[in-house]
UniProtKB/Swiss-Prot annotation:
Domain of life: Bacteria
UniProt similarity note: Belongs to the tRNA pseudouridine synthase TruA family.
Keywords, comma-separated and alphabetical: Isomerase, tRNA processing
Gene designation per UniProt: truA
Residues annotated for substrate binding in this entry: 114
Protein name per its UniProtKB record: tRNA pseudouridine synthase A
GO MF terms, alphabetically ordered: RNA binding; tRNA pseudouridine(38-40) synthase activity
Species for this entry: Lactiplantibacillus plantarum (strain ATCC BAA-793 / NCIMB 8826 / WCFS1) (Lactobacillus plantarum)
Subunit text: Homodimer.
EC number: 5.4.99.12
Keyword Isomerase appears in the UniProt entry: yes
Catalytic activity: uridine(38/39/40) in tRNA = pseudouridine(38/39/40) in tRNA
CDD domains with a match to the protein in the record: PseudoU_synth_EcTruA (cd02570)
Location of the active site: 56
């Protein structure tokens, strides 16, 4: 009888080639799989991990979620401590729990929350270059805040998905889309909570919103972009370094509570 574990993971994506395992590349999936199998004494049948979503190279996470099965039961705190003793310093397990054997980290999600940090300055800040997306020209937060609400709701986001997406259905629902400025840090920050997000969707939305803030697009352009269903209309993609997978939701009551809170 196997025991299924749910793990909440945080990582600095700077030195990872993304989440998904790739040949001859350092990925989150690769280092976590190695640690899990080492903790389990390298079983004959290797343990496989399943993540809630794939992050690209350079993208960070506070709350990536994954699951795996062990052939026996260990106290969740023992699993957390054991994995953290084996994982590299840019990765940490924040929480571990035992879940039903039919739980799936990817398919049981009811929502995800992403955070983006856009740094505005003529030159790159060496201390922010791995943790913010750099934008050379300043954006007007008032224009962005006027426009961002048009992304909320259920839409076909074909304009906001990068080529290479494996999703056949581009309809997603954004429950909440917010932006605010931190003038002392020269940052504009964004937070998006939705049913799920397409490949590079958040980064493309941020790129469009920053162009609106810079006056390169009209404040009311988003409905027309959505209607166009044409990736070429959105043009750019914000840098990966500014994006953080903040939280994955599996319970509607927790999702609704956070929507009220934030």
């Amino acid at each position: 009888m196997t025991t299924r574990y749910k793990v909440v993971l945080a990582y600095d994506g700077t030195n990872f080639a993304g989440f998904q395992r790739q040949p001859h590349q350092r990925t989150v999936e690769q280092v976590v799989t190695k640690a899990v199998n080492k903790m389990a004494k390298d079983p004959v049948e290797p343990i496989v991990i399943y993540g809630a979503g794939r992050t690209d190279a350079g993208v960070h996470a506070f709350g990536q979620t994954l699951h795996f099965d062990l052939p026996y039961e260990i106290n969740p705190e023992g699993v957390r401590r054991g994995l953290n003793s084996m994982l590299p310093m840019d990765t940490i397990v924040k929480a571990v729990s035992i879940v039903p054997n039919d739980f799936h980290a990817r398919y049981d999600t009811v929502g995800k929350r992403y955070w983006y940090r856009a740094y505005q300055n003529e030159f790159v800040d060496p201390f922010k270059r791995h943790y913010t997306g750099h934008f050379k020209f300043a954006a007007d937060i008032d224009r962005i805040q006027q426009a961002i609400g048009d992304l909320e709701g259920r839409h076909d986001f074909s304009t906001f998905v990068a080529s290479g997406s494996q999703a056949h259905d581009h309809v997603r629902e954004i429950y909440s889309a917010k932006a605010w400025a931190l003038p002392d840090e020269r940052e504009i920050q964004f937070e998006f909570c939705g049913s799920g997000f397409l490949y590079n969707q958040v980064r493309i939305m941020v790129a469009v919103l920053m162009e609106i803030g810079q006056g390169r697009r009209a404040v009311d352009c988003i409905p027309a972009l959505l209607a166009a269903k044409d990736r070429e209309q959105a043009r750019g993609t914000a840098p990966a370094a500014g994006l953080y997978m903040k939280k994955v939701y599996y319970e509607q009551n927790e999702l609704q509570a956070d929507l009220i809170k934030y």
